[in-house]
Amino acid sequence: MAQTHISESNIIIENKTFSGAHFAREVHPDGTPRGTFRSYTVLCDGDNVTFRNCVFENTAGRGKDVGQALALYLDGDNITLEDCILRGHQDTLFLAPLPEKEIIPGGFLGPKQFTERKRRVYRFKNCTIEGGVDFIFGGATAYFENCVFVSVEEGYVFAPSTPRDVEVGFVAKDCRFVAGDDVRDGSCFIARPWRDHGAVEIINCYLDAHINSAGFDDWGKTHAHSTVRFIERGSLGEGAKGKRADFVKVII
């Protein structure tokens, strides 16, 4: 299965479909497990790149069976996706930079493990992103407008690792959080912090009943309740009801 690496800057890519099926537990040609960051279908590290009407998918399967499997790995600056579809399960979309250090030795094995952690900004408009566990993750500043986030299994939409000194992490405005077939009510969360200063803000979004009444999860990191930056403004739908976790700032 070919992987696509896009390194050219200042380009527009339209009407393309990229499909792959590599996964973290797969044995790499070098004899080691492939790992998360070598499982991508597409890696784009060019700057000022726009994708329009493109499809990115990783069909390896559920995370419980294959581990992480990236459809799209972004590590350029000022990348925009318009009217695109992303499909996967665990870790569908990675938005660089990586955190400074891995928790598990070798956890960042891949094309960017030793590169400088540069601040990145990404924009998504009118996109559909499907996944299960932590399916949008990373340390970037990313804006999602009029997008649909489809939870295809129980899990978490966002897993931010926003650096402490970066004010804005992931922002979703006028988006829809919906459930795939057979996803139970209350079985999914908007976000959980991959690192202690993770930042997510959702604004005027529709939340289906699969979103748990707590809204956000702390990933067992009670020490991070005072450092995470989870903000919710003007949510609608069944998933907007109930008492939010006490580390979430809700603005009516």
What does each model-found stretch correspond to?
Residues 1-252:
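Sequence-level preference for short, compositionally simple segments enriched
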